[in-house]
């Protein structure tokens, strides 16, 4: 299954707010159901609940079905909680790191910067959005002038307290902001509200 490129509002109306996909907030279709209609609704199955959790994770981080399945398989082979390791793997992707630093408004925007070869990790150009960042990595945003003003305005409007503790943003060189990965992200700093165990359960027979 390819990466979704359709209307984003349609997705967040169905799956609720996804900060990585869009910064727009809308009321989900479930919340719009009137009291009279609620009585006629069928009970949601456990499969549907797990499917929705999986879809929320996939669309928020902009993954294909195959990519997410591969991440689940990697998490299963690692020591520790499969769900938490899965979230760590997704949060430590380069495109998500740029998003969490406040350099770009969404993960798709971060992916565009990376694909255009404007991002350096440890002084080397990286053009792979899924690149896995590690503690002590230094990420430099070397965007051209056309991007610099946009990035500067974005950073100025982004509250510093929104940057999670495992990351640090340095503006000592305004034209080349730098991000520092301090350590692996912990569960409390995950940007998406989700029950990761539902995703693990969804893939229990597939991974």
UniProtKB/Swiss-Prot annotation:
This is Small ribosomal subunit protein uS4c. Keywords: Chloroplast, Plastid, Ribonucleoprotein, Ribosomal protein, RNA-binding, rRNA-binding. The gene is rps4. InterPro entries: Ribosomal_uS4, Ribosomal_uS4_bac-type, Ribosomal_uS4_CS, Ribosomal_uS4_N, S4_RNA-bd, S4_RNA-bd_sf. GO terms for cellular component: chloroplast; small ribosomal subunit. Part of the 30S ribosomal subunit. Contacts protein S5. The interaction surface between S4 and S5 is involved in control of translational fidelity. Residues 92-156 form the S4 RNA-binding domain. The lineage of its organism: Eukaryota, Viridiplantae, Streptophyta, Embryophyta, Tracheophyta. It comes from Equisetum pratense (Meadow horsetail). GO terms for molecular function: rRNA binding; structural constituent of ribosome. It comes from the Eukaryota. One of the primary rRNA binding proteins, it binds directly to 16S rRNA where it nucleates assembly of the body of the 30S subunit. With S5 and S12 plays an important role in translational accuracy. GO terms for biological process: ribosomal small subunit biogenesis; translation. It is found in: Plastid, Chloroplast. Belongs to the universal ribosomal protein uS4 family. The keyword Ribosomal protein applies. Pfam families: Ribosomal_S4, S4.
């Amino acid at each position: 299954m390819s990466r979704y490129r359709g209307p984003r509002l349609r997705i967040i109306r169905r799956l609720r707010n996804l900060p990585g996909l869009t910064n727009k907030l809308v009321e989900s279709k479930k919340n719009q159901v009137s009291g009279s209609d609620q009585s006629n609704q069928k009970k949601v199955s456990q499969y549907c609940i797990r499917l929705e959790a999986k879809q929320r994770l996939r669309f928020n981080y902009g993954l294909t079905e195959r990519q997410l399945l591969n991440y689940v398989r990697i998490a299963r082979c690692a020591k520790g909680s499969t769900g938490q390791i899965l979230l760590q793997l997704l949060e430590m992707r380069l495109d998500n790191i740029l998003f969490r630093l406040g350099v770009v408004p969404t993960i798709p925007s971060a992916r565009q910067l990376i694909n255009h070869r404007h991002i350096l990790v440890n002084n080397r150009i990286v053009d792979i959005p899924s690149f896995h960042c590690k503690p002590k990595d230094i990420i430099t945003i070397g965007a051209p002038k056309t991007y610099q003003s946009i990035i500067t305005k974005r950073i100025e409007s982004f509250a510093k307290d929104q940057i999670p503790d495992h990351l640090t943003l340095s503006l000592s060189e305004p034209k080349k902001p730098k991000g520092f990965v301090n350590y692996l992200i912990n569960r409390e700093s995950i940007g998406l509200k989700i029950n990761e165990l539902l995703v693990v359960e969804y893939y229990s027979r597939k991974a």
